[in-house]
UniProtKB/Swiss-Prot annotation:
Keywords: Membrane, NAD, NADP, Plastoquinone, Quinone, Thylakoid, Translocase, Transmembrane, Transmembrane helix. NDH-1 is composed of at least 11 different subunits. NDH-1 shuttles electrons from an unknown electron donor, via FMN and iron-sulfur (Fe-S) centers, to quinones in the respiratory and/or the photosynthetic chain. The immediate electron acceptor for the enzyme in this species is believed to be plastoquinone. Couples the redox reaction to proton translocation, and thus conserves the redox energy in a proton gradient. It holds the Pfam family NADHdh. InterPro entries: NADH_UbQ_OxRdtase_su1/FPO, NADH_UbQ_OxRdtase_su1_CS. This is NAD(P)H-quinone oxidoreductase subunit 1. Its EC number is 7.1.1.-. The gene is ndhA. GO terms for cellular component: plasma membrane-derived thylakoid membrane. It comes from Crocosphaera subtropica (strain ATCC 51142 / BH68). One of its GO terms (molecular function) is NADH dehydrogenase activity. It is found in: Cellular thylakoid membrane.
Length: 372
């Protein structure tokens, strides 16, 4: 694996230099990733919610949030405070333990997945050598929480929503994993940092989107389905099943579903940017940038600037994808459940298998271009 800026190792080493033993330093590190994940993901969600409401308003020729802060930027905060103080109701015949555990199982894996996301030039909380596999494994836990929430609510609409969520997740998780496997095959690594490093050196031409155009579309469609974004929001289709598995929820439990949905959208966009859009890499190669600026490629200030701007590049790519997902909400109709399942099993699955086999063949035929 590449020697990047591993926050865990750097944090422990810094405390050791201050005279703190390694055991105590590791104990101090334990709550630190959780703090970073919660703060970063929550801020990201607040931005996405505000963007979605403003974009939705523009699509419908409305103003949108306006009074809570400048341009209504504090409206998501106001909504969050409102949900915190709303009454937490548990239906009389619901299973209270499963009813409470469902939202937790939906949110927790998504937050933990941020551990392996490199936000900048090798800037990652924990650089796992199986990082991308870790993300796929965690993403398979959330549907269990959705099914649990639907079953525990003792409501027919909630149960239908939970069953739809489970069926949808199973149908699209396999094509998504196969499209990621093609990237892993080219990168010869499951580390998210190694995957980005494999795309470096050639600017925009080195990004995996050009070598994996089919996988690019498979991943995008499957990610939208996993996030339950239109046109794949069947588990909570208001016109058909009220609010799906969320029907009986209120207060903070409802807020957890709401939070998990948007955190998952931002996470999927970040992973998408890492796999296909070069992560923190610039569209222009670093040597060309140094040549245009008339400085050495090894210049310390150039390295600092590019490392700092790398974080901005990762976030900009992710939010561009979020913008497209939000825009799709007002441009495409919702599909039927049979169309949803047919698309996953009869089209995306075989195409993703063919794409994987084709990638293996190209890797053998053109090892330089496809990571042989």
């Amino acid at each position: 694996m590449n020697s990047g800026i591993d926050l865990q190792a750097s944090f422990i080493e810094s405390l050791n230099q201050l005279g703190i033993p390694s055991g105590a330093a590791k104990a101090l590190w334990i709550p630190f990733p959780s703090f970073l994940m919660i703060i970063g993901a929550t801020v990201g969600v607040l931005v996405v919610v505000w963007l979605e409401r403003k974009i939705s308003a523009a699509a419908q020729q409305r103003i949108g949030p306006e009074y809570a802060g400048p341009l209504g930027v504090l409206q998501p905060v106001a909504d969050g405070i409102k949900l915190v103080f709303k009454e937490d109701v548990i239906p009389a015949k619901a299973d209270p333990w499963l009813f409470t555990l469902g939202p937790v199982l939906v949110v927790l894996p998504v937050f933990v997945s941020y551990l392996i996301v490199p936000f900048g030039q090798n800037l990652v909380i924990t650089d796992l050598n199986v990082g991308i596999f870790f993300w796929i494994a965690l993403s398979s836990i959330a549907p269990i929480g959705l099914l649990m929430a639907g079953y525990a609510s003792n409501n027919k609409y909630s149960l239908l929503g939970g069953l739809r969520a489970a069926a949808q997740s199973i149908s699209y998780e396999i094509p998504l994993a196969l499209s990621v496997l093609a990237i892993v095959m080219m990168s010869n690594s499951l580390s998210t940092i190694d995957i980005v490093e494999q795309q470096s050196g050639y600017g925009i031409l080195g990004w995996n989107i050009w070598r994996q155009p089919v996988g690019f579309f498979i991943f995008w469609i499957a990610a939208l389905a996993e996030c339950e974004r239109l046109p794949f929001d069947l588990p909570e289709a208001e016109e058909e099943i009220v609010a799906g598995y969320q029907t009986e929820y209120a207060g903070m439990k409802f807020a957890l579903f709401y939070l998990g949905s948007y955190v998952n959208l931002v996470l999927s966009a970040l992973v998408f940017a890492i796999l296909y859009l070069g992560g923190w890499e610039f569209p222009v190669p670093l040597d060309k940038l140094a040549e245009w600026l008339g400085v050495s490629e090894d210049s310390s200030w150039l390295q600092v600037i590019t490392a700092s701007l790398g974080i901005t590049m990762t976030v900009l790519k992710a939010y561009f994808l979020v913008f497209i997902a939000v825009l799709m909400r007002w441009t495409v109709p919702r599909v039927r459940i049979d169309q949803l399942l047919d698309l996953g099993w009869k089209f995306l699955l075989p195409v993703s298998l063919v794409n994987l086999l084709l990638t293996a063949a190209l890797k053998l035929a053109f090892p330089v271009a496809f990571g042989g």
